[in-house]
Amino acid sequence: MALFRKKDKYIRITPNNSLKGSVSHNVPEVPDELFAKCPACKHMIYKKDLGLAKICPTCSYNFRISAQERLTLTVDEGSFQELFTSIETKDPLRFPGYQEKLQKAKETTGLHEAVLTGKAMVKGQQIALAIMDSHFIMASMGTVVGEKITRLFELAIEENLPVVIFTASGGARMQEGIMSLMQMAKVSAAVKRHSNAGLFYLTILTDPTTGGVTASFAMEGDIILAEPQSLVGFAGRRVIETTVRENLPDDFQKAEFLQDHGFVDAIVKRTELRDKIAHLVAFHGGGQ
């Protein structure tokens, strides 16, 4: 009997074709270019609020920026003279897909390689400058990166210039094998010659600075600065924990941790780096 029939758990709705098309599909789309999500605090940020320095207004996280953006923030307008743009990798291993990956990175970043090198003025002080860009194959160090930085030091010796390097890297470039690892020794030898000439070398560690770059010229500066919360290390956290069989501190391999343990001289806000560089260069004799 219908009187004792169990009631349906859900309401039944009969499709009505007359309703089709009555709902507007003209929902405005928000362009991806307008907002960015902060990796640290997870807030959605209107990109214009990040400013030129690209610093999160909520938690002060420093977004990764390109070499060109770094150049704009650091040097005197119109003073940069790019050098060593004609050096090309020989692709010693004929690594499959490597040339295509290089070409894509060049098109995406507008750079010749993972490091931008040249001479520039910072508040009237002339310097030899290198800026690594993590957007170019994670700023991995191959033969071209090593050669460009080595030549920069050699030029600095000839012209009696201080060297300033913004480091960022995922390590040695695996597509070039042992040749990429040899760049560590080559650049370090150039750093030593520059030091023997009595010239100033300043490094600024940015996020991330890891692998062979950390194990060589990144940590060889006369003074070592770092941006806040930058990841700086050699091997990865999980590799170390597996090896030593211990849990590492939460802030392990952060710039602040390195400063507390004497590996970094100072943590400097991105917006203050230009003034700090100019001050340190002038204090150590300046660039002629």
Curated annotation (Swiss-Prot):
<comment type="similarity">
    <text>Belongs to the AccD/PCCB family.</text>
</comment>
<keyword id="KW-0444">Lipid biosynthesis</keyword>
<keyword id="KW-0863">Zinc-finger</keyword>
<dbReference type="GO" id="GO:0005524">
    <property type="term" value="F:ATP binding"/>
</dbReference>
<feature type="binding site">
    <location>
        <position position="38"/>
    </location>
    <ligand>
        <name>Zn(2+)</name>
    </ligand>
</feature>
<keyword id="KW-0808">Transferase</keyword>
<feature type="binding site">
    <location>
        <position position="59"/>
    </location>
    <ligand>
        <name>Zn(2+)</name>
    </ligand>
</feature>
<comment type="subunit">
    <text>Acetyl-CoA carboxylase is a heterohexamer composed of biotin carboxyl carrier protein (AccB), biotin carboxylase (AccC) and two subunits each of ACCase subunit alpha (AccA) and ACCase subunit beta (AccD).</text>
</comment>
<keyword id="KW-0862">Zinc</keyword>
<feature type="binding site">
    <location>
        <position position="56"/>
    </location>
    <ligand>
        <name>Zn(2+)</name>
    </ligand>
</feature>
<protein>
    <recommendedName>
        <fullName>Acetyl-coenzyme A carboxylase carboxyl transferase subunit beta</fullName>
        <ecNumber>2.1.3.15</ecNumber>
    </recommendedName>
</protein>
<dbReference type="GO" id="GO:2001295">
    <property type="term" value="P:malonyl-CoA biosynthetic process"/>
</dbReference>
<keyword id="KW-0275">Fatty acid biosynthesis</keyword>
<keyword id="KW-0443">Lipid metabolism</keyword>
<keyword id="KW-0276">Fatty acid metabolism</keyword>
<dbReference type="GO" id="GO:0006633">
    <property type="term" value="P:fatty acid biosynthetic process"/>
</dbReference>
<dbReference type="GO" id="GO:0009317">
    <property type="term" value="C:acetyl-CoA carboxylase complex"/>
</dbReference>
<dbReference type="InterPro" id="IPR011762">
    <property type="entry name" value="COA_CT_N"/>
</dbReference>
<dbReference type="InterPro" id="IPR034733">
    <property type="entry name" value="AcCoA_carboxyl_beta"/>
</dbReference>
<dbReference type="GO" id="GO:0003989">
    <property type="term" value="F:acetyl-CoA carboxylase activity"/>
</dbReference>
<dbReference type="GO" id="GO:0016743">
    <property type="term" value="F:carboxyl- or carbamoyltransferase activity"/>
</dbReference>
<feature type="zinc finger region" description="C4-type">
    <location>
        <begin position="38"/>
        <end position="59"/>
    </location>
</feature>
<comment type="function">
    <text>Component of the acetyl coenzyme A carboxylase (ACC) complex. Biotin carboxylase (BC) catalyzes the carboxylation of biotin on its carrier protein (BCCP) and then the CO(2) group is transferred by the transcarboxylase to acetyl-CoA to form malonyl-CoA.</text>
</comment>
<dbReference type="InterPro" id="IPR000438">
    <property type="entry name" value="Acetyl_CoA_COase_Trfase_b_su"/>
</dbReference>
<feature type="domain" description="CoA carboxyltransferase N-terminal">
    <location>
        <begin position="34"/>
        <end position="288"/>
    </location>
</feature>
<keyword id="KW-0067">ATP-binding</keyword>
<comment type="pathway">
    <text>Lipid metabolism; malonyl-CoA biosynthesis; malonyl-CoA from acetyl-CoA: step 1/1.</text>
</comment>
<dbReference type="InterPro" id="IPR029045">
    <property type="entry name" value="ClpP/crotonase-like_dom_sf"/>
</dbReference>
<dbReference type="Pfam" id="PF01039">
    <property type="entry name" value="Carboxyl_trans"/>
</dbReference>
<dbReference type="GO" id="GO:0008270">
    <property type="term" value="F:zinc ion binding"/>
</dbReference>
<keyword id="KW-0963">Cytoplasm</keyword>
<keyword id="KW-0479">Metal-binding</keyword>
<keyword id="KW-0547">Nucleotide-binding</keyword>
<feature type="binding site">
    <location>
        <position position="41"/>
    </location>
    <ligand>
        <name>Zn(2+)</name>
    </ligand>
</feature>
